[in-house]
Amino acid sequence: VLRNAVIRLRNLYRLRRSLQRLNPDLVFFACLDDMLPTLAPLWLFNLLLPYQWSGLLVQSALPPYHRGMPDTRPFLRSKNCVGVGILNEYSAKGLETFQRHILLFPDFADLSAPATNYPLLRKLKERARGRKVISLLGSINFRKGIKLLLESIPLLPKDEYFFLIAGKSSLTAQQENDLRAFGESRNNCLFSLEKIPDESCFNALIAESDLIFAAYKQFTGSSNLLTKAAAFRKPVIVSRGLCMGRRVEQYG
């Protein structure tokens, strides 16, 4: 905890030295989460960042605040902060204690026309052969609910449903081997643990899917996967209660 706090303060010091040459009227941080300190007196933070600033707080739904514990939110009270943007509208009320000017940002998504010549798309069509396609897409890790999906696959008729997992993996080598072995043992699975080349290819997989699996574990943030699912009119499975679940219940 202390090491992380020191690293963040050191980064702010370096940033201040870089900004001195520019003397900006306003500094905007595209990911404020990585810039705010976790442990420091507020006067020191104001000294290190003496310019008016704002930014996007990507993960804005945080655990309850406890005074004296490492937390970025008290630094939103800085006299130089002119406002904070968030993606998760349900977290706004909890942040108003620290900053009155909270702005809701849309979670933009690239809706480029689906690629028609993507090799993985052709392979999916060949393997699925008309079955309903359930897809888990994007960065592949166990926070994305892979375990739940794998437990569900044997419970559904394999002649009716086909399962796609595609995206860049952050699993261990053993986890990847286990996942591939599971997929290869069944005729209704296609697992590709490589990065999806671009948004057109990503959208092609969305368009070919019948259901998007997004039941992430303890994920409190927003995801533009909901935007893509809505744009391509695909139903989506999400975890109940948090941001994505509340949006689906409210608008779905």
Sequence positions of predicted segments:
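Short N-terminal targeting/anchoring amphipathic segment
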Residues: 3-8, 15-38, 54
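Active-site proximal beta-strand in glycosyltransferases
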Residues: 26-31, 42-63, 85
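Glycosyltransferase donor-sugar binding loop
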Residues: 137, 162-177, 195
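Conserved donor-binding/catalytic core segment of Leloir-type glycosyltransferases
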Residues: 124-144, 150-153, 163-165
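Short hydrophobic beta-strand element within catalytic cores of glycosyltransferases
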Residues: 211-212, 235-239
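Acidic donor-binding loop of glycosyltransferase active sites
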Residues: 204-221
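Donor nucleotide-sugar binding/catalytic pocket of nucleotide-sugar-dependent glycosyltransferases
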Residues: 54-63, 74-122
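Nucleotide-activated donor-binding/catalytic signature segment of Leloir-type glycosyltransferases, i.e.
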Residues: 131, 175-200, 204, 208, ...
